[in-house]
Curated annotation (Swiss-Prot):
Specifically methylates position 2 of adenine 2503 in 23S rRNA and position 2 of adenine 37 in tRNAs. m2A2503 modification seems to play a crucial role in the proofreading step occurring at the peptidyl transferase center and thus would serve to optimize ribosomal fidelity. This is Dual-specificity RNA methyltransferase RlmN. It is found in: Cytoplasm. The active site is at 89 (proton acceptor), 344 (s-methylcysteine intermediate). It is an enzyme of class 2 (transferase). S-adenosyl-L-methionine binds at residues 170-171, 202, 225-227, 301. Reaction proceeds by a ping-pong mechanism involving intermediate methylation of a conserved cysteine residue. GO terms for molecular function: 4 iron, 4 sulfur cluster binding; metal ion binding; rRNA (adenine(2503)-C2-)-methyltransferase activity; rRNA binding; tRNA (adenine(37)-C2)-methyltransferase activity; tRNA binding. Keywords: 4Fe-4S, Cytoplasm, Disulfide bond, Iron, Iron-sulfur, Metal-binding, Methyltransferase, rRNA processing, S-adenosyl-L-methionine, Transferase, tRNA processing. [4Fe-4S] cluster binds at residues 120, 124, 127.
Length: 354
């Protein structure tokens, strides 16, 4: 692609391209990220010569929306095409409806599940994304644009709050530089102004980069795709564990700066007759000792060709009750978007006519 992607850049970087004075970058950010304008010609307070320069050098929005599906539970999945015809999927989940309380409208709460790569290198045994292999990293702008589309599409300035989770296609920490820049762009007060406290990075456990992310002091939340409590099983489920075993991941988490009001989220995908027994729950309690933790139990979502099976509700409840009785906050994630393949582990690149 000959032109640069506007959404790839922080305001100070735009100034290096000759976009001066400083207030111009603020105006541009507000047009793009507050008014959702993706055509420089529509920016009324930008000088004509600057518009011409920008049109020649930049495209604003790098994603083309080519498909939109809505599940029976209201979960929405978006398929985007990029300049090279590769595609990524983004999922929007409504967590809480608007409500009227004391005569005031309380905002609805949504979570957008953002992709960071086309495909994935990690190769988790239970995840459909990795079946097609790794294709490429997304740029910061291609990550940011997924959130931009959600805010534009759903008019999020009207009684709607949006949280961002980097839990879509790909391993976020394997695309580290673009991830960090995207976090900063989303948080910029002249733009979408999504605080890092409302952004969660989910990782399968690249221990050195967990430490590096902590040293950035961005204030983001951390989620760990744990899924097993011993290395032998975790290596079968998550091959990355051969490079970074459970102990190294836990050590990195202990060094990660956690807001006193927050906890580290541990995602535990429960697979029938694999990791759903009480002995696994006991080991999990021991493993998380001393870490401010919240465990999110996730039903395995079957897909064509897998031998893994979904656990029953009684087993999930028994596992949850054991953790709670041991003082660990634990929730069971309600699988959303299963009928449109938008649930955990079901996202993948789609073939399109090229």
């Amino acid at each position: 692609m000959d032109k640069k992607i506007f959404m790839d850049y922080l305001p100070e970087e735009l100034m290096e391209f000759g976009i001066q004075p400083k207030f111009r970058t603020k105006q541009l950010y507000q047009w793009v990220y507050r008014k959702y304008v993706d055509d420089f010609e529509e920016m009324k307070n930008i000088p004509k010569d600057l518009k011409a320069k920008l049109k020649k050098e930049f495209i604003i929005n790098p994603l083309e929306l080519i498909n939109h599906e809505i599940a029976t539970d209201g979960t929405e999945k978006f398929l985007f095409k990029m300049h090279d015809n590769h595609t990524v999927e983004t999922v929007l989940i409504k967590m809480k409806d608007e409500e009227i309380k004391d005569g005031k409208i309380k905002e609805a709460k949504y979570t957008v599940c953002v992709s960071t790569q086309v495909g994935c290198k990690v190769g988790c045994a239970f995840c459909l994304t990795a079946k097609g292999g790794f294709v490429r990293n997304l740029s910061a702008g291609e990550i940011v644009a997924q959130v931009w589309w959600m805010k534009k599409f759903k008019n999020f300035d009207e009684n709607k709050a949006l949280n961002v989770v980097y839990m879509g296609m790909g391993e976020p920490l394997d695309n580290y530089d673009a991830l960090v820049k995207a976090i900063k762009i989303l948080a910029n007060p002249d733009g979408m102004n999504i605080s890092p406290r409302r952004q969660t990075v989910s990782t399968s456990g690249i221990a050195p980069k967990i430490k590096r992310l902590g040293n950035e002091n961005l204030g983001v939340n951390l989620a760990i795709s744990l899924h097993a409590v011993d290395d032998e099983l975790r290596e079968q489920l998550i091959p990355l564990n051969k490079a970074y075993n459970i102990e190294s991941v836990i050590d990195a988490i202990r060094e990660f700066p956690i807001d006193k009001r927050k906890k580290v989220m541990f995602e535990y995908l429960v697979i029938k007759d694999v990791n759903d027994d009480i002995e696994s729950a006991k080991k999990l309690v021991k493993l998380l000792n001393g870490i401010p933790s919240k465990v999110n139990l996730i039903y395995f979502n079957p897909y064509p060709g897998t031998n893994f099976k979904r656990p029953d509700d009684a087993t999930m409840k028994k596992f949850q009750d054991y953790l709670i009785n041991k003082g660990i906050m634990c929730t069971i994630r309600k699988s959303k978007g299963m009928d449109i393949s938008a649930a955990c582990g079901q996202l993948r690149e789609k073939e399109i006519n090229k």
